[in-house]
Amino acid sequence: MFSFFGDESKLPASTVMVSRMTVKKQAAARQQSSGPMAGPSKPSNVTPKHSHGSLKGTPRSASEKGTPKQGPSSSSKSTSKVKQEERIRPSTIPRTPASSSSPGRLKRKTPKVQVVESESSSGSESSDDALDSKPKRPKVTRKETGIDMTPLPGEQVVGRRVFCWDKVDMRGEWGRGWAGFVGCDEVVRGNVQGWANGGGGDGSKNLGKYRAFFPQEGFDRDGDFLPSVEVLYPAKGCREKFVLMVPSSDREFNPIGELRNTLRLILEHYIPPSHRHIFGNLAESLDISNPLSSLPSRMTTPLPNSLVTPPPDPASPSPAFAFEISATSTPAPSTERQETIADLIRKSLAPNRRDGPLFVTAIERYNSAMQAIQEDGTLQQWLDEGMNGGKGIKVREWAALVDFVHDQAYSRVVGGYSHELEHHPKHPEEVSKAISGKEDAYGELRHAFMSKIIEQTKLGPDSVFVDLGSGVGNCVLQASLQAGSRSYGFELLPVPAHCARLQVREVQRRWAMWALKGNLDVEVHEGDFRVHKEVGRRLREADVVLVNNEVFPSSLNMDLADMFLDLKEGAKIVSLKPFVPEGFRMNESNCDSFAAILRSTQHDYYRDWVSWKGEWGNYYVAVIDRSRRIKFEESMTGRASRRR
């Protein structure tokens, strides 16, 4: 038999050095073949004095090859019991019934391998470790099964309240009902009214971009008439009218696609287990990918032909935890599976049916069932007690819900300005020259990119987030809801700054419609962040600063470095160009530079994480750490004193 060390049968016997041993012989007894007390003790239980590189004990094969026997015999034919009393240190390995059984049945133990780290590797930091000076918590391993219990990225729970039914009215229109949001029909007509007007166009011309989705009579446009249905949101009494038409181009707003995903997320996150047999689930019936962000952010919504005819819903699973059902709630379903609301929606939207009347029936059933659980308090009780305010929702699922809600607002108040979000002559001359060589003068960081930043920088409800060059406010609003942070943005161009102000108002209305808890301390400012009066105060408070400086000239990056000197210890700077030169080493000539107080790491972003290109790239996270410079100054002072 070959082992790791070669032919096991030809291994020489290891030398056992024993300082003193006492052997007591007892009366001969018939050796038992099994049992915890049968057979003599193993010689390997004696702890020998040997070097660390040798094997412990004597291999069984070596004793059977004619090795001179000393002390008690290990042969299975031995007729005497031997008891060894060791005067040296006791064995560190406790004896178990298996270790005291017959030596003939013992298998050779595999020696333990000890991993020795080099001095250089023990003090090194990975790119993620460099963001936090505190050591990472070690992985927890279940001893019984050896299963690694560290959750996968996105599978951790949020751990804070994200649903706030009790604060919906406080963030509404102060008793005026739900008349403050921009409706789906206004976007389709291209004529946004009210407080958000000015971003639309000719309604009749815009309607020519849409066509009927359902082939039945009455589901096509007739003059100003648009086929539509009203859908009830989780907030009590909040309804929105969705137009039942689809765009001719993938680049246009898709009301059917948005309605479908609205229903999917409501059925997935808001329905109590006691009523899932009525509503069903649409998650498994839609062709939606499952990354950190499961919905496209600020991009075209999938066309209805992406739907497939799915199998029926499986029976609703039992809830993971108990939820008390009120006396007025719907009784439990019978053993025979009933057709759910999700079943009707799935059938009506299937490409081989496209049944408009059936879809209207399904929406009517949904509205009636949703209104019932709103009025009897079941929905509020589920969100507050059963869901514990959403503390147990997974990070990945929460990010997808945030993305969709913000995408609704973006489509309504920013989409109409897409033709104006271009390079503007108000840029400073040096910035204009740098941007003129780019294919796209205006760019946005997409939802997946910002989700990674939130995870990587550990943004939370106690954090302050500042975005220098915030555009239309996407990242500012995402940090305020997804992380619950206080968020502030500063944008130079007037059109993106105007869109940001519109989007803040629309997004906060959407939070209320979905009963979501976001941080209302959100501000977006228009002006040059180098001279704006609010920038200095917000930077001194900031925990995370984001700056998209990919097209900034070197002079502007130098101005930013001077501004960042006021950042507090431990603050993080996320940028697309580094503030620490490659190969930077602190010395007497550069110890006063901004790079001397930074710990910088490079990371990759992936395709479609930015709007201006479909390729991957690099971004950088720098942490303010003045201790490195202090240590360098102390070492320089020590050298100077020794020279004297």
UniProtKB/Swiss-Prot annotation:
Record Pfam families: DOT1
Domain DOT1 intervals: 297-637
Biased composition (Basic and acidic residues): 131-146
Residue ranges with Polar residues bias: 93-103
Domain of life, per lineage: Eukaryota
Compartments it resides in: Nucleus
Regulation affecting activity: Ubiquitination of histone H2B to form H2BK123ub1 is required for efficient DOT1 methyltransferase activity on histone H3.
GO molecular function: histone binding; histone H3K79 trimethyltransferase activity
Keywords: Chromatin regulator, Methyltransferase, Nucleus, Repeat, S-adenosyl-L-methionine, Transcription, Transcription regulation, Transferase
Biased composition (Low complexity): 68-81
Swiss-Prot/TrEMBL catalytic activity: L-lysyl(79)-[histone H3] + 3 S-adenosyl-L-methionine = N(6),N(6),N(6)-trimethyl-L-lysyl(79)-[histone H3] + 3 S-adenosyl-L-homocysteine + 3 H(+)
GO CC term, one of those recorded: chromosome, telomeric region
Region spans: Disordered: 21-152
Binding annotation for S-adenosyl-L-methionine: 442-445, 465-474, 491, 528-529
CDD domains: AdoMet_MTases (cd02440)
EC number(s) from the headed UniProt entry: 2.1.1.360
Note: In contrast to other lysine histone methyltransferases, it does not contain a SET domain, suggesting the existence of another mechanism for methylation of lysine residues of histones.
Function: Histone methyltransferase that specifically trimethylates histone H3 to form H3K79me3. This methylation is required for telomere silencing and for the pachytene checkpoint during the meiotic cell cycle by allowing the recruitment of RAD9 to double strand breaks. Nucleosomes are preferred as substrate compared to free histone.
Similarity comment: family membership: Belongs to the class I-like SAM-binding methyltransferase superfamily. DOT1 family.
The protein, known as: Histone-lysine N-methyltransferase, H3 lysine-79 specific
